[in-house]
Amino acid sequence: MIHKLTSEERKTRLEGLPHWTAVPGRDAIQRSLRFADFNEAFGFMTRIAIKAQEMNHHPEWFNVYNRVDITLSTHDAHGLTERDILLAQFIDHVCAHTQPAA
């Protein structure tokens, strides 16, 4: 069974994810990204989708043209888990190598 992060675990784990913010009213984190164009945004989403499928852990996301908004939370645990942290770290790693627009 997947356990929801405790308040202390959450605080400690999120210190390493400065680009992610808490979602108001939910035990979830979010990040918004902008890319040069739709092709770059979709390419980024494809890389994340492949990893998410491998992890069997899928983000909630929204895409319009060059913008991608991502929310992470584990539905089975009703909140933030280590799976969300690992996927957020992977997303940050991909961002560091794809250089989204400011």
From Swiss-Prot:
- Would you identify the family this protein belongs to, as annotated? Belongs to the pterin-4-alpha-carbinolamine dehydratase family.
Annotated signal sequence is: none
Query: Mind telling me which NCBIfam families this protein's record contains?
Result: PRK00823.1-3, PRK00823.1-5
Record-level GO BP terms: tetrahydrobiopterin biosynthetic process
Residues spanning the membrane = none
State a single Gene Ontology molecular function: 4-alpha-hydroxytetrahydrobiopterin dehydratase activity
Under the heading Pfam families, the entry gives: Pterin_4a (PF01329)
State its Enzyme Commission number(s).
4.2.1.96
The reaction(s) catalysed by this protein are: (4aS,6R)-4a-hydroxy-L-erythro-5,6,7,8-tetrahydrobiopterin = (6R)-L-erythro-6,7-dihydrobiopterin + H2O
- For this UniProt record, give its keywords in alphabetical order, as a comma-separated list: Lyase
InterPro entries, alphabetized = PCD_sf, Pterin_deHydtase
Q: Any keyword Hydrolase?
A: no
Q: What is this protein called?
A: Putative pterin-4-alpha-carbinolamine dehydratase
